[in-house]
């Protein structure tokens, strides 16, 4: 049997309400044509993000009741540290309120360390593909974010197993161009969100790590979707088909020195993050000094004890192979149905979302008028479905020139929350696209009425171009 049903029983439900077209038009106008600013009650199916939007298990809810809310030395912190060491193999753990909390205490410490060694006169971070908040933290600290993902990622119509891989030649060229002394860190993003939730192979992770070690550059693994990446390795990479996901995860983290993690994704919690170190106690201690004023005391990092307990449990649940098979299958189900309906997507589908290629679907709208965001708005008006643009709007402007950064792709991300929606919901999404497809030529681009200078896509306000 190819179909994989939900590997869980539903114990509690939350009612959702379908709005009228007139209600949606009014809500979108009041939100400045930015679905980020819509109230959730105005949304029928919410595919904005998989971050913190999943459903926790009965075991996680039981863990919530075991929260130790001591300011210092919570037992839940020690349980979390033990789980990180057991499952990932890293010795030192700092909890944070979410992934960007880890970035805001780690990145400036890495830059300061590099400068203390006589480098980082023109600091850069290199990644397969920085996500938006990661790039923002790099740039806010005066460094430059450089992406060197494989060019195969930009051909959305052609199948390739590893569209999250680094372009190894481009990585070496970039290090040589900027000088190893200026490369603060290499960030390996698993899976690679901005290229379509696409996996990176273990062979590529290993090659990147070996290059980094040759130049004495630390490797940070951006770990939001590490379980999904491990599942793809098990399914696609030769020699790993008989390895367990847990074994693959352990090997993945051998090719990094530290990690940042938004635990709101694969570890299945609503809030939380991690900043962990394999064996560098000195760096761990330096970062902890930033944790106290920025996130909170080092044994809670902005989290309640109950949330750390749910996270410790979720780290293991996220590696469950029955769950991962269902999870990846549901994403593929939506993607395959959209392709059958003639909707172009990033192919093959990735781990957490289906990415519609708005550049192909709306060729009449140029990148600077945000075709994927325009499609996002139309999908909401059509069916009450909220999704998110991954393209020119998200990429933003060059901080030095103020000009729009050229985006290689204009994608609409249909992000599926974990253990929340059934395939009936996915069928509804497909039907909305089929209905919407008929009026694609009439969709107009957008322009700003308010544009923030940093991470503009979150709170920008726009209007349709007449």
Curated annotation (Swiss-Prot):
Indicate where the modification N6-(pyridoxal phosphate)lysine is found in the sequence: 265
What is the species of this protein?
A: Photorhabdus laumondii subsp. laumondii (strain DSM 15139 / CIP 105565 / TT01)
Q: In which pathway does it act?
A: Amino-acid degradation; L-tryptophan degradation via pyruvate pathway; indole and pyruvate from L-tryptophan: step 1/1
Cofactor(s) the record lists: pyridoxal 5'-phosphate
E.C. no: 4.1.99.1
Q: Which SUPFAM superfamilies match?
A: PLP-dependent transferases (SSF53383)
Protein name as annotated: Tryptophanase
Q: How does it assemble?
A: Homotetramer.
Gene name linked to the record: tnaA
Q: Which GO terms describe its molecular function?
A: tryptophanase activity
Enumerate the catalysed reactions: L-tryptophan + H2O = indole + pyruvate + NH4(+)
By sequence similarity, the record places it as follows: Belongs to the beta-eliminating lyase family.
List keywords of the entry alphabetically.
Lyase, Pyridoxal phosphate, Tryptophan catabolism
Enzyme class per UniProt: lyase
Record's InterPro entries?
ArAA_b-elim_lyase/Thr_aldolase, Beta-eliminating_lyase, PyrdxlP-dep_Trfase, PyrdxlP-dep_Trfase_major, PyrdxlP-dep_Trfase_small, TNase, Tryptophanase_CS
């Amino acid at each position: 049997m190819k179909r994989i049903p939900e590997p869980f029983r539903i114990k509690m439900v939350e009612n959702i309400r379908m709005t009228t077209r007139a209600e949606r038009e009014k809500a979108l106008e009041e939100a400045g044509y930015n679905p980020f600013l819509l109230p959730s009650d105005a949304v029928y199916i919410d595919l904005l993000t998989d971050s913190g939007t999943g459903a926790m298990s009965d075991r996680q809810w039981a863990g919530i009741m075991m929260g130790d809310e001591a300011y210092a030395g919570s037992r839940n912190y020690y349980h979390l540290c033990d789980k990180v060491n057991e499952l990932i193999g890293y010795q030192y753990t700092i909890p944070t309120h979410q992934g960007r909390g880890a970035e805001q205490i780690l990145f400036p410490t890495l830059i300061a360390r590099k400068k203390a060694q006589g480098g980082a006169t023109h600091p850069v971070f290199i990644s397969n593909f920085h996500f938006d908040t990661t790039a923002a933290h790099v740039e806010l600290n005066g460094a430059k974010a450089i992406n060197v993902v494989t060019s195969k990622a930009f051909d959305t119509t052609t199948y390739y197993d590893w569209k999250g891989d680094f372009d190894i030649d481009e990585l070496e060229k970039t290090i040589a161009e900027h000088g190893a002394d200026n490369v603060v860190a290499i960030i390996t993003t698993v899976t690679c969100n901005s290229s379509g939730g696409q996996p990176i192979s273990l062979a590529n992770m290993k090659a990147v790590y070996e290059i980094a070690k040759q130049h004495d550059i630390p490797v940070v693994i951006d770990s939001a979707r590490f379980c999904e990446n491990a599942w793809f390795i098990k399914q696609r990479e030769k020699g790993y088909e008989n390895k367990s996901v847990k074994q693959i995860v352990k090997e993945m983290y051998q090719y990094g020195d530290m990690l940042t993690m938004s635990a709101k994704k694969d570890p299945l919690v609503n809030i939380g993050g991690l900043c962990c170190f394999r064996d560098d106690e000195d760096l761990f201690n330096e970062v902890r000094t930033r944790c106290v004023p920025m996130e909170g005391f080092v044994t809670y990092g902005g989290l309640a004890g109950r949330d750390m307990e749910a996270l410790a449990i979720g780290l293991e649940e996220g590696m469950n192979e029955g769950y991962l098979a269902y999870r990846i299958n549901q994403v593929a189900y939506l993607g395959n149905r959209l392709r059958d309906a003639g909707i172009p997507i990033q192919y093959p589908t990735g781990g957490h979302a289906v990415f519609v290629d708005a550049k192909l679907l709306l060729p009449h709208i140029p990148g600077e008028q945000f075709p994927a965001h325009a499609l996002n708005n139309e999908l909401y008006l059509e069916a009450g479905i909220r999704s998110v643009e991954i393209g020119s709007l998200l990429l933003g402007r060059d901080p030095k020139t103020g000009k729009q950064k050229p985006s290689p792709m204009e994608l609409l991300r249909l992000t599926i929350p974990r253990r929340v929606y059934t395939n009936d919901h996915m069928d509804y999404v497909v039907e909305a696209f089929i209905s919407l497809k008929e009026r694609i030529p009439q969709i107009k681009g957008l322009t700003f009425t308010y544009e923030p200078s940093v991470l503009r896509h979150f709170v920008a306000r726009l209007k349709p171009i007449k």
